[in-house]
Amino acid sequence: MTTIPDDPLGDRMKEYEMMEAGRRALPGLPLLVRLDGKAFHTFTKGLERPFDARLQRVMDATTRHLVKECGARIGYTQSDEISLVYHHEGKAEPFLGGRFQKLTSILAATATFVFNRQLAAELPEKAERMALFDCRAWVVPSLEEAANTFLWRELDASKNSVAMAAQARLSHADLQGLSTKQQQELLFQRHGINWNDYPARCKRGAWFHRVEVVRGFTTDELDKLPPLHAARKDPDLRVCLLYTSPSPRDRTRSRMPSSA
């Protein structure tokens, strides 16, 4: 019988590592994640103001990928940020075991990769730049507080949206000390631009939720299956499909204000 030698040095080093790297989210509680673009105020210089639809499409595609491939239940994006929520009822294993460092590093790396992969098609003038995302994660005590977290981010999105629309047309001196409502009114008075006429995506961001559909195979799908696939012998076999779907509000198209 081979005796495995003790490794006190390795054991001690692993203990140090796991004191921090081993931290996990409390089971059963909603886990919130927020990713932010690093120095995007510099990265986005030269893009269309106040809103660039191409950048929005890249952010939407990145959020959709995180929801579909990384187990989040809901994803929300506005400006240069993405918010996700994870919630696993019962004994279901949370994404990456709920380990904070592993989860944040994987999500930041995934968002960075997916975002940069989209640049050549949507923003070719930025394709040579490297966009980066940071990530943080935390738990909240209830689903109600998870919903409030998203409400907070959407309210922030609307406030930022008004500011961006106003700053695209008005000077810093014009806007100094004005409330969000006052900025909105001045934009309309000076330029005839009604902020409410912007598309919902520009005013409130975009939502994606995870949808699982269990159904039988279609005839076309059965024809394409390998000869020995179990579904050929069992017509009642079900398939579980995963979709990411935008909220109904985000499917509503509205035109940009003509003078924007």
Predicted regions and their residues:
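Long, highly charged amphipathic alpha-helices
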Residues: 54-65, 102, 106-114, 165
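Catalytic NTP-binding/metal-coordinating core of nucleotidyl cyclase/transferase enzymes
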Residues: 19, 27-82
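Hydrophobic alpha-helical segments, chiefly the membrane-spanning helices
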Residues: 254-260
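Long, charge-dense
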Residues: 90-132
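Juxtacatalytic helix/coil linker segments
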Residues: 2-31
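Catalytic core of nucleotidyl cyclases, primarily class III adenylyl/guanylyl cyclases
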Residues: 74-98, 127-147
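Conserved small/polar residues in nucleotide/adenosyl-binding loops
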Residues: 243-252
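Catalytic "initiation/cleavage/transfer" segments centered on a nucleophilic residue
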Residues: 21, 122-236, 241-242
